[in-house]
């Protein structure tokens, strides 16, 4: 009897570890104007913009948003820098990422109107 209980506990523990690992591997993606980026990349974009100020000379020389010149820009955001509308796309992505009702943030996608 004790061995069955131990086996049941072990099975529950394995299932719990599996669920935690599975949840960690799933990413939330935002698709906007043909670009597909991870939510965590957009959040990193906001962090990069807040901590990095490029030189005024660099800003004057480049039509791209200044964050496009940051070496830590996530790879999935880099193609956006090639677009003429990069600044407005980055702004839209930040807006979408900041609004829970724009994302399916819970399993049932409920709670937003």
Curated annotation (Swiss-Prot):
The keyword Signal applies. Disulfide bonds join 68-81, 101-109, 104-112. One of its GO terms (biological process) is negative regulation of blood pressure. Residues 28-97 form a propeptide. This is Guanylate cyclase activator 2B. It is found in: Secreted. Belongs to the guanylin family. Endogenous activator of intestinal guanylate cyclase. It stimulates this enzyme through the same receptor binding region as the heat-stable enterotoxins. May be a potent physiological regulator of intestinal fluid and electrolyte transport. May be an autocrine/paracrine regulator of intestinal salt and water transport. PANTHER family: GUANYLATE CYCLASE ACTIVATOR 2B, GUANYLIN FAMILY MEMBER. It holds the Pfam family Guanylin. GO terms for molecular function: guanylate cyclase activator activity. It comes from Sus scrofa (Pig). Its main location: secreted. One of its GO terms (cellular component) is extracellular region. Gene3D superfamilies: Guanylin. It comes from the Eukaryota. Residues 1-27 form the signal peptide. InterPro entries: Guanylin (IPR000879), Guanylin_sf (IPR036382). Keywords: Disulfide bond, Secreted, Signal.
């Amino acid at each position: 009897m004790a061995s069955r209980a131990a086996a049941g506990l072990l099975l529950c523990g394995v299932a719990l570890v599996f669920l935690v690992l599975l949840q960690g591997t799933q990413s939330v993606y935002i698709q906007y104007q043909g670009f597909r980026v991870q939510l965590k990349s957009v959040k990193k974009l906001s962090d990069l913009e807040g901590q990095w100020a490029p030189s005024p000379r660099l800003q004057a020389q480049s039509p791209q948003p200044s964050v496009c010149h940051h070496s830590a820009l996530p790879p999935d955001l880099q193609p956006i820098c090639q677009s003429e509308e990069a600044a407005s796309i980055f702004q839209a992505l930040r807006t979408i990422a900041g609004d829970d009702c724009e994302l399916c943030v819970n399993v049932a996608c409920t709670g937003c109107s």
